[in-house]
Amino acid sequence: MLVWLAEYLVKFYSGFNVFSYLTFRAIVSLLTALFISLWMGPHLIAWLQKLQIGQVVRNDGPESHFSKRGTPTMGGLMILFSITISVLMWAYPSNPYVWCVLFILIGYGIVGFIDDYRKVVRKNTKGLIARWKYFWQSIIALAAAFTMYSIGKDTSATELVVPFFKDIMPQLGLLYVLLAYFVIVGTSNAVNLTDGLDGLAIMPTVFVAAGFALVAWATGNVNFAAYLHIPYLRHAGELVIVCTAIVGAGLGFLWFNTYPAQVFMGDVGSLALGGALGTIAVLLRQEFLLVIMGGVFVVETLSVILQVGSFKLRGQRIFRMAPIHHHYELKGWPEPRVIVRFWIISLMLVLIGLATLKLR
């Protein structure tokens, strides 16, 4: 909203024209979200401790996690607040893509909040009943998917971008809604499954958001979009502001979530961030790129699917415990080693994903 104010004030002082530059607003969006989360962190942690809103740890989990019992959770509130305020300050309020992401971010944040509340108040590790969680995730995702489809119906905004093939971009039609639904819900739950160790989920989220910031900038620039053979989407540029806000808020949260964590993000953070990343990928027409850059989330999810499927079909487990980060813990890896190695893998996957944009 400050952009509109700057457009008015530029008549009196030309220096306010700097607010029209996307790169400038991206930087201050990151810094705004970072400083808000750093300021909010100690206050939120103290408030959560006062209310005794602490993590409920599974009794069948790794023994090293028992010491985490009682650590404040629902820290994702600071992430959501930081992102929302920063985006509202620095993005153009008239941009529909921005509102689609915020709708998912806040909507999934509410679902996650209810889930966390049931866990910490009722001391139930299962939280919100799975079918109700999935129901509300589906309703919110479908509402966003139909809205996004109506915005870009029968244009390049609803084409499927296939990696490595610059001339293959089929028009999806209503299949766009179905694809968007699965990407949003799937990514939300994938990030949620990954959030099992201190800082494990937030840093890959930051890496992927940073990668999408570059993609959004290129997609919103007609010359670079043509150069990379990706669809030019006129609303995509403002998603840079959203992505950098996620980066800033994520880094601010990591300050308190790094091992040993002072606070956990909880489902209010993981479901919301995953949903936001999925929505950004859909809006940029880069669902396949999300699979590559978010490979850590994909592997974590597949490990759970394979573990459950193998046990039901063969009565045997593939991993010592799923998601797969627990498998490595039970193999004797110290928690910080698991975390940092997953971070390194995530960074590599983001760089590989970005490289595929030119391999067409």
UniProtKB/Swiss-Prot annotation:
GO terms for cellular component: plasma membrane. It catalyses: UDP-N-acetyl-alpha-D-muramoyl-L-alanyl-gamma-D-glutamyl-meso-2,6-diaminopimeloyl-D-alanyl-D-alanine + di-trans,octa-cis-undecaprenyl phosphate = di-trans,octa-cis-undecaprenyl diphospho-N-acetyl-alpha-D-muramoyl-L-alanyl-D-glutamyl-meso-2,6-diaminopimeloyl-D-alanyl-D-alanine + UMP. It is an enzyme of class 2 (transferase). This is Phospho-N-acetylmuramoyl-pentapeptide-transferase. InterPro entries: Glycosyl_transferase_4, PNAcMuramoyl-5peptid_Trfase, PNAcMuramoyl-5peptid_Trfase_CS. Catalyzes the initial step of the lipid cycle reactions in the biosynthesis of the cell wall peptidoglycan: transfers peptidoglycan precursor phospho-MurNAc-pentapeptide from UDP-MurNAc-pentapeptide onto the lipid carrier undecaprenyl phosphate, yielding undecaprenyl-pyrophosphoryl-MurNAc-pentapeptide, known as lipid I. The keyword S-adenosyl-L-methionine does not apply. It comes from the Bacteria. GO terms for molecular function: metal ion binding; phospho-N-acetylmuramoyl-pentapeptide-transferase activity; UDP-N-acetylmuramoyl-L-alanyl-D-glutamyl-meso-2,6-diaminopimelyl-D-alanyl-D-alanine:undecaprenyl-phosphate transferase activity. Its cofactor is Mg(2+). The chain crosses the membrane at residues 27-47, 72-92, 94-114, 132-152, 168-188, 199-219, 236-256, 263-283, 288-308, 338-358. Keywords: Cell cycle, Cell division, Cell inner membrane, Cell membrane, Cell shape, Cell wall biogenesis/degradation, Magnesium, Membrane, Metal-binding, Peptidoglycan synthesis, Transferase, Transmembrane, Transmembrane helix. It comes from Yersinia pestis bv. Antiqua (strain Angola). CDD domains: GT_MraY. HAMAP family: MraY. Its main location: membrane.
